[in-house]
Amino acid sequence: MPDNILVAVAWPYANGPFHVGHIAGAYLPADVFARYQRLRGNRVLMVSGSDCHGTPITIAAEREGITPQDVIRRYHPTFLKTFQTLGISFDLFTQTYTDNHYRVTTDIFLRLLENGYLYKETMVGSYSETLGRFLPDRFVEGTCPNCGYPRARGDQCDGCGHLHDPQDLIAPRSVLDGAPVTFRETEHFFLDLAKLEPQLRAWLDSVDRSYWRPNTLLFTQNWLREGLRGRAITRDLEWGVPVPVDDPTFKDKRIYVWFDAVIGYYSASIEWAQRSGAPDAWQEWWVCRPDGSSPARSYYFIGKDNIPFHTIIWPAILIGYGDLALPYDVPANEFLNLEGDKMSTSRNWALWAPEIEERYQSDAIRYYLIANGPETRDSNWSWADFVQRVNSELVATWGNLANRVISLTHRNFGAVPQPGALIDADRQLIAATQQAFEQVTTLLEGVKLRAALQEAMALAQTANQYLSDQEPWKLVKSDQERAATVLFVALRTVDTLKTLFCPFLPFSSQRLHELLGYSGTIAPQPYVEETDAPDGAPRLILTGDYTTEAGLWTPSVLAPGQPIHAPAPLFQKLDESIVADELARLHAKVRS
């Protein structure tokens, strides 16, 4: 039977376009994994959406004198366009500003309250004397007490990833007017993490989690080592999910964004089921079986700054609610730097996805971001390296192999030729192809995407060497049967590589699928649909029908006689002048 696989992807704040660090950190790895699992024949549900209640949205709205809804309507469509252009195959990319999400968040809050995992407590809140109001944590900046980073946010430091409260900062100030922040008492609801800690530890210790990435495991262990304490889940805010209690104290408070955002994975699954016409289908990924086992393997693709929210806080919420599936794996990526320096949106030192997706092939961007991906350590986008790797690996290795084999076959046979007797060189390539297929499969199962892509490219190099050694362009003139055998073996390898590369390079893999004489779709793409927001305005979502790729993860069974079509290059060679042009463009926009 096929497995149920939940691919849950980090919810981006709808306050600005994506840069390549966002794509490399969560969305592209999730898509590669989801496409692979669908090809395996498993039942995949890949969900995410725009986080509409994040403080950065409120900050942007206040600075421009517009509403948070206006900010969301500006940037949410840009996310969908980037995902479409790059082929990020969500079953549903929605947003937290929906009636469904508000209902689900309310249900979870009330269940936790009923089960005794929420409590009220008076805390100290950040207050602006100049504005006469409480400030959300992200409206506060100061020096990090842990590492000394001068622009640490009120809830977390971008310099070291440390989580803290605003009063922990040195010289805290308001991001709205730069005025010093004071602190006043205010009452809020807290999630009782200390009460949930024994169950959380039991879950984490129930299996060997060495398959988690080292940094994910280390972050989680460090949090537990320090001991868990209650964490506020409401804030003095005007924008967000209302606190569902009959208490005038909480009339002007809202559920805190970190609590409602992680619930989005669950609420998006419910929305997907409702839209699919099978309103209870979400349960097949979420509701535990009678014996307590999970109905699915749940993978959460995030950046490293969100690890504790997904390995501690979200599992604690699920445990407190009861009978919902806990994460199986949390493949958290490190950060992608740019030309050796950390990306900074405030300085505009970033490579914006809407810009580069217009200038370069989607598969070229996808290839570089995985081949150079920040899986276990920070990595770096370098324009010189991008051009070199696209030209030497995508164009000269994989693209050249596919083009040579298909061109020779189409020109001399018009179809997959009937092979003759095999020699040792043929058998060696056949064995190498089978071995690579098994190795890539194992690596993808372990979410080792970078190594899997390297393994596939190594097979392309081996196949190129086989062609160079066998010289079928000469054999077609002197030994047709031998030429037919060489091209048959090479075609089988190219066809297998098409499948291995498909999760990484869906656009070129689909074109190659058609050149090899297949009908149908091996790499379906997402599309945009329109629905309504709670205020009645049009709301866009991203969805797709990916059933056509199910069960196609097999080594080649290309049969003699199958038509082979005239090829065109799969990838565009990049001119070396691109490096200087892009660096000039980058430096022209940077702010001091």
From Swiss-Prot:
A motif ('HIGH' region) lies at residues 12-22. It catalyses: tRNA(Met) + L-methionine + ATP = L-methionyl-tRNA(Met) + AMP + diphosphate. ATP binds at T345. Binds 1 zinc ion per subunit. One of its GO terms (cellular component) is cytosol. GO terms for molecular function: ATP binding; metal ion binding; methionine-tRNA ligase activity. Its EC number is 6.1.1.10. InterPro entries: aa-tRNA-synth_I_CS, Anticodon_Met, Met-tRNA_ligase_1, Met-tRNA_synth, Methionyl/Leucyl_tRNA_Synth, MetRS_core, MetRS_Zn, Rossmann-like_a/b/a_fold. Signal peptide: none annotated. GO terms for biological process: methionyl-tRNA aminoacylation. Zn(2+) binds at C144, C147, C157, C160. Its cofactor is Zn(2+). It comes from the Bacteria. The keyword ATP-binding applies. The keyword Transcription regulation does not apply. It is found in: Cytoplasm. Keywords: Aminoacyl-tRNA synthetase, ATP-binding, Cytoplasm, Ligase, Metal-binding, Nucleotide-binding, Protein biosynthesis, Zinc. A motif ('KMSKS' region) lies at residues 342-346. Monomer. Belongs to the class-I aminoacyl-tRNA synthetase family. MetG type 1 subfamily. Is required not only for elongation of protein synthesis but also for the initiation of all mRNA translation through initiator tRNA(fMet) aminoacylation. This is Methionine--tRNA ligase. It comes from Roseiflexus sp. (strain RS-1).
